[in-house]
Swiss-Prot record:
Highest taxon listed in the record's lineage: Archaea
Keyword 4Fe-4S in annotation: yes
Lineage: Archaea, Methanobacteriati, Methanobacteriota, Stenosarchaea group, Methanomicrobia
Disulfide bonds: none
Organism field: Methanosarcina acetivorans (strain ATCC 35395 / DSM 2834 / JCM 12185 / C2A)
Keyword 4Fe-4S: yes
GO cellular component, one term: primosome complex
Family of the protein in this entry: Belongs to the eukaryotic-type primase large subunit family.
Coiled coil region boundaries: none
Gene (UniProt): priL
Pfam families in the cross-refs: DNA_primase_lrg
Subunit structure comment from the entry: Heterodimer of a small subunit (PriS) and a large subunit (PriL).
Sites where the protein binds [4Fe-4S] cluster: C230, C301, C310, C317
Listed name of the protein: DNA primase large subunit PriL
Amino acid sequence: MQAEKLAYYPFISEASAHVGDLGISLESLLNSRAYRTARARGIERVKEALEGEIKKPPVSEEAQVLSELLSYPFARMLVACVDDQLFTRRYALAEAKAAYTFLRNETPDFLLEFGEDFGISAEIRDSHFSMHFTDYIRFSNSLKEPSWKLTNRQFRAGKIKITKEEFARLLEEAVRERIEQSFPIPEIPPEVSAFCAPYVAEIKEQFEVQKKKFGATDFGAVEPELFPPCISHALANVQGGVNLAHSMRFAMTSFLLNVGMSVEEILNLFNVSPDFDAEKTLYQIEHIAGATGNEYKPPACDTMRTYGNCIGKDGLCAKISHPLGYYERRIFLKNKEREKEEGKEKGNEEKKEKREEHEKKNEKGNEIKEK
């Protein structure tokens, strides 16, 4: 693949190998004036991701290609230093969406080669693509439009029939997954952390503004840190701009309504989704909230397991049969612990008062003796 093409897809194996062959050291990438443009582009790349769209201008000259290629590893350094799961999801989604704008215009043969880098085996038949159903399920699972459901697909001999544009859309999901799963980076070199610190501080500040804008942290009296793992995972996906399967979307929305979040607060959560439709989403939330006369409860744990939505089970999950029961139990345990701590503090205060009273009596006794 030509270097110009690799610059548009810096996350594929061939692009990584190409950058490695250039022999540019980490110290040079961080400090050399020769790569100042690449660093600036890396910073721009991350900031654009926060806004939801990474713009990729055409590159033709060798210097432009090099700058675009090297901006990706530097951007990854910044994301690693920010070290925030929601931030990582937003970044991965933006990179994947940027890739899709180019993938949809590539030739079928190019898309097949691109898919192989992600372990996706497909073939061209007549005017469509054919891919194994396991790959299809893996990468279409987060796409909530009914047309992506397996029941709405032509299925023969373990293969699914899809269009060229649909195949490109699934490749977008593969890109998002690869980038997202490449974080966190276990050990960040100290020199990288030190160099990136001022840029990371600026990016974090911008990120906080974004979170407030989308209501990602405004849960009022609701305590999200006590949510069951399945709901926490769904929330992280939504706030990262990842589409949920319909069953998980219903489960999360009904759960949040039942624990006290308002329709408006939940609507703000979905506002980061790539295909956000405010009117449609509002209708769905209000329907679950009971605007049509039927108020819905979230599904029980057995149902969550049936639909593949039981994720990240912990010790408490084994004793609970419903997500709301999990939340109620966590609140009970937290209140019990708080009462215990308050009891300790009260006991310590009483002991302190008795000790002070005893000391005063001793002081009076000593004064009498002295007289």
